[in-house]
Regions:
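A short helix-loop-beta submotif of the ANL/AMP-binding
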Residues: 81, 94, 100-120, 124-128, ...
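Conserved AMP-binding/adenylate-forming core of the ANL superfamily
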Residues: 37-40, 57-102, 106-110, 127-132
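Conserved AMP-binding A3 loop
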Residues: 69-71, 197-225, 231-235
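Gly/Ser/Thr-rich phosphate-binding loop
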Residues: 204, 275, 297-305, 314-376, ...
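Conserved pre-ATP/AMP-binding loop-to-beta segment of ANL
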Residues: 183-201, 208, 244-253
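ANL superfamily adenylate-forming
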Residues: 65, 148-193, 208, 220
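AMP-dependent adenylate-forming
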Residues: 22-30, 46-69
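Conserved AMP-binding/adenylation subdomain of ANL enzymes
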Residues: 220-256, 261-301, 316
């Protein structure tokens, strides 16, 4: 294991040195705080989403009987952004989304952020009063939602309500009608790296849900860091003589089986796929039997959810009726996976198990482990994701603990 760790560190140093893809530099952010950032780095998430144009007509979003390419997705997003601008939405304004997973969630998400507004994904499991609280707390001017969420908001004034086309209702303007005839190209807006991009709500340990602001810099840094550790791990496996498919493999795809209002859904499954050109197969809600069918039909290579979901796949009565050999990773987060489950997953799927630890406040990044490292140490949460992440473990008096304590 020590040789493997030494090789990991060696490759990390190679990939982050001057002139390489993940070269870093030390600077001060807009508030004067010292930070480390990637040298090769989009100025904002609008520039990050433009990377999707490089994937062109390649399939990006699959939802039920619909299929959208990267270009079609970004065209829809641009139309939504332009419609918001015509409605008076300006840089820094908050626009909420509250609905089950569907492509219009992603169109809206990209469009909101690309015009410099702040995207506020709300928990679609909330009741009306909880949604109203978050709308008021975030000072949202617009909400895009489905009928179940919008029907409880009739008394909310000064809030434009747009209904997803997947649950049409004559009392609300539909997403398709709202974006119709608007340009598919967005004009450039001055957006700085440290400008706010999103507000996600966490359950909070006490009291009401807490709104977590994230910047363009923070979100892009997470995506680049995940790409960095993926390339390090792939290169390490290759040098050790093992086969490993890189994250940039053009045939990779991921099953989006968790809500987009959670960073596991939006960041791990959706946003990361923009960078690497990965196909995203969307589920409106979790169903293990349906997931098995989709994995087989769409040749899904990656699944990331809570550990319970992969456990349900393993124990589903239809598992052996379908070809699931396309799976390369069965990752989890949001809680620990029982140690005894790790080997069972590894023994019963061709894909390798993995686990990660992160927070809404960190854009889901923190630690990560997969493959042999995980199987041999199934109680671990993994290594710190390089090269930007730092983790300290403190005691109750805020003193940093020594290693092993």
């Amino acid at each position: 294991m020590s040789n493997s760790n030494n090789l990991f560190d060696q490759i990390k140093d190679e990939f982050t040195r001057e002139g390489e893809m993940f070269e870093t530099r030390n600077i001060r952010d807009d508030k004067g705080f010292p930070i480390t950032e990637y040298v090769s780095f989009p100025d904002n998430l609008k520039g990050y989403f433009d990377i999707g144009r490089l994937h062109g007509d390649k399939e990006f979003l699959i939802y039920e009987n619909e299929r959208f390419s990267f270009n079609q997705t970004l065209d829809n997003a641009a139309q939504f952004g332009n419609a918001l601008i015509l409605d008076g939405i300006q840089k820094g304004d908050r626009v909420a989304i509250c609905m089950q997973n569907n492509p219009e969630f992603i169109f809206a998400y990209i469009g909101i952020i690309s015009i410099g507004a702040v995207c506020v994904p709300l928990n679609s499991w909330w009741v009306a009063d909880e949604i109203k609280y978050a709308l008021e707390h975030s000072d949202a001017k617009v909400i895009v939602g489905d009928i179940k969420r919008l029907q409880g908001l009739e008394d909310v004034k000064d809030l434009k309500k747009i209904i997803t086309s997947y649950t049409p209702n004559d009392n609300f303007v539909s997403f398709k009608d709202y974006v119709k005839d608007h340009p598919k190209i967005l004009n450039e807006v001055e957006i700085k790296r440290d400008d706010n991009a999103t507000i996600y709500y966490t359950s909070g340990s006490t009291g009401k849900p807490k709104g977590v602001l994230s910047s363009h810099r923070g979100i892009i840094s997470t995506m680049f860091s995940w790409a960095c550790i993926s390339k390090i791990l792939t290169e390490r496996e290759n040098r050790l003589g093992n086969d490993a498919a890189p994250l940039t493999d053009p045939d990779l795809s991921i099953l989006l089986c968790v809500p987009l209002f959670h960073v596991t859904g939006s960041h791990v499954a959706f946003l990361m796929s923009v960078l690497v050109g990965r196909k995203v197969v969307m589920m409106k809600k979790w169903d293990a039997g349906e997931a098995i069918k989709l994995i087989s039909e769409e040749k899904i290579s990656d699944i990331t959810g809570v550990p319970t979901q992969t456990w349900e796949l393993l124990n589903h009565p239809d598992k052996d009726k379908y070809d699931l050999s396309s799976l390369k990773t069965l990752a989890g987060g949001g809680g620990p996976r029982p140690a005894e489950h790790v080997k069972m997953l590894d023994d019963n799927f061709e894909g390798r198990p993995g686990i990660g630890y992160g927070l809404t406040e960190t854009n889901a990044i923190g630690t990560l482990v997969t493959g042999d490292d995980y199987v041999s140490n199934p109680s671990t949460a993994g290594r710190v994701v390089p090269p930007l992440t730092e983790i300290k473990i403190l005691d109750e008096n805020w003193n940093e603990l020594e290693e092993g304590k």
